[in-house]
Design a protein with these regions (language model features):
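Sec-dependent signal peptide recognition
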Residues: 1-9
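Hydrophobic h-region of N-terminal signal peptides that target proteins for export
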Residues: 8-16
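Noncatalytic, solvent-exposed loop/strand surfaces
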Residues: 16-466
């Protein structure tokens, strides 16, 4: 670990330094802390940096001056991550030109681009770091052995972000199980979950969410799709709702990677989930409230709410939906319709494949995986502009975040594009870390925590020494 110490002009209150889950407490990563930095590099505005062994695309979470994150260490070599969203398509096209049959093509693709369970032996860890110094307080191994399923090298074996209530940390890894630890690293309980096949061994990614005394997960896979609630005190399953969505024959897509959302609105509190081709909302006992067709076959962006509306990204080539509280039944739009009694508006061409949009200062900022950046009025759905961040912007998986009148877009090469908030597109600067990046950052008071493939950084604005 290396770190730099300097004097600061102010001290963040502990309450402002809580980041309890993926994309923050409100699932919309913004902050009003004016001390947060908008410039950084591997040497600039670095409070500390800590090497994190292994690999994981899970985000850091923060509570009571501690950072928690997961990683997986592989015995021997692990296949290097892939940038972009080509996946294996180009490779398949090359093999087809060689005249290979389908069976041989699939064998070569799996050998090059996937890690299968029999190929790797893994050790899964939960790390606890000190927020002020980056020092590792403790680490706990919570699973080991061959994984229950494989992964594409675009994914990791720990892409799910833990969640905390300030008393315990709840770690969910798809097809492995749920684990609970106290803040001193003592394991409180462990609940295995069944291992179900994911489409083409792409791996899992949907994080858990927490409300009251319950932990909620969604598992959209090829065999037994379900949403479930568990008692956070014991790990026992409280309810399970089977989901029959997506394609139903052969090996067609029934898997998804979307984190669910607890929507506390003026009518009720509900669990919003997005699966293949269909979004479904449940009450907190697992009863279906409403459903919406028209979602992509392989959804990834997460739903979230602000300003009284729920925003649901339908995926690449699909609409962005704004949904009113109190919906019931099938709220799917009719042919050619852009709104109905439950849907306030849709913007038909604004769905994206990977990053989740961010809502900031009355607008939605939508980032596509190839660097196309859009601003949409959050109340009306009117498109303000659509622009390319840069001719060489690269590829994006991380969701954008916002503060101090700026939107931040981190690409997979470690470059962050800083865009001015407002009705005109203006790229202010880029910040370069020169390290592969797939994890969404955390904002903890006046600290920005960014996880790259090898390192966790704490960025904090320097001030003059006293």
């Amino acid at each position: 670990m290396r770190f730099t110490v300097w004097f600061l002009s102010g001290v963040a209150l502990l309450g402002a330094a809580e980041w309890p889950q993926f994309r923050g407490a409100e699932s919309n990563p913004i902050s009003a802390d004016t001390r947060l930095p908008d410039k950084w590099s591997a040497t600039e505005n670095v409070e500390w940096s800590t090497a994190v062994p292994g690999r994981g695309w899970s985000s850091p979470i923060v509570s009571k001056g501690r950072i928690f994150l997961t990683t997986v260490v592989t015995d021997g070599e692990s296949k290097k991550p892939q940038t972009g969203t080509e996946y294996s398509n180009q490779y398949v096209a090359e093999l087809q030109k060689q005249g290979l049959d389908e069976k041989e093509i699939m064998a070569r693709v799996m050998a090059r681009d996937f890690e299968l369970p029999h190929e790797v032996n893994l050790r899964y860890f939960l790390y606890c770091l000190d927020l002020a110094t980056g020092a590792v307080r403790w680490k706990r191994e919570f699973h080991s052995g061959h994984p229950p399923g494989g992964r594409h090298r675009k994914n990791s074996f720990t892409s799910e972000t833990p969640v905390t209530d300030g008393s315990a940390i709840y770690v969910y890894t798809g097809n492995v199980g749920l684990h609970a630890f106290d803040f001193d690293g003592k394991q409180l309980w462990r609940t295995p979950v069944e291992a179900n096949p994911i489409y083409l061994e792409f791996g899992t990614a949907a994080s858990p969410v927490l409300h009251g005394d319950r932990i909620f997960i969604v598992s959209d896979n090829q065999e037994r799709q379900y949403a479930a609630a568990f008692d956070k005190r014991t790990g026992k399953q409280v309810w399970r709702a089977n989901r029959d969505i997506g394609e139903t024959t052969g090996s067609r897509m029934r898997s998804a990677w979307t984190t669910p959302y607890i929507w506390k609105n003026k009518v009720r509190t509900e669990l919003v989930t997005v699966g293949p081709k269909t979004a479904i909302s449940y009450d907190l006992e697992g009863k279906e409230l409403w459903r919406l067709n028209g979602v992509a076959a392989s959804p990834i962006p997460s739903p979230f709410a602000t300003g009284g509306l729920l925003y649901l990204n339908g995926g690449r080539g699909k609409p962005l939906f704004a949904i009113r509280p109190g919906a019931t039944g099938d709220i799917t739009l009719g042919e050619g319709a852009r709104s109905n009694v439950s849907i306030a508006w849709t913007e038909r061409r604004s769905g994206v494949y990977l990053p989740t949009p961010v809502a900031y200062e009355g607008a939605l900022y939508v980032l596509g995986e190839t660097g196309i950046f859009s601003r949409i009025d959050a109340a009306t759905g009117k498109l303000t502009y659509r622009a390319r961040l840069d001719d060489n912007a690269g590829s994006f998986t991380v969701s954008p975040w916002a503060y101090n009148g700026r939107i931040f877009c981190l690409n997979e090469d470690g470059r962050t594009f800083v865009v001015a908030a407002g009705e005109e597109f203006q790229l202010l600067r880029t910040n370069d870390l020169d390290d592969f990046s797939m994890a969404s950052p955390a904002i903890a008071g006046d600290r920005l925590l960014v996880r790259t493939e090898s390192t966790l950084y704490s960025f904090r604005t320097r001030s003059a020494p006293k």
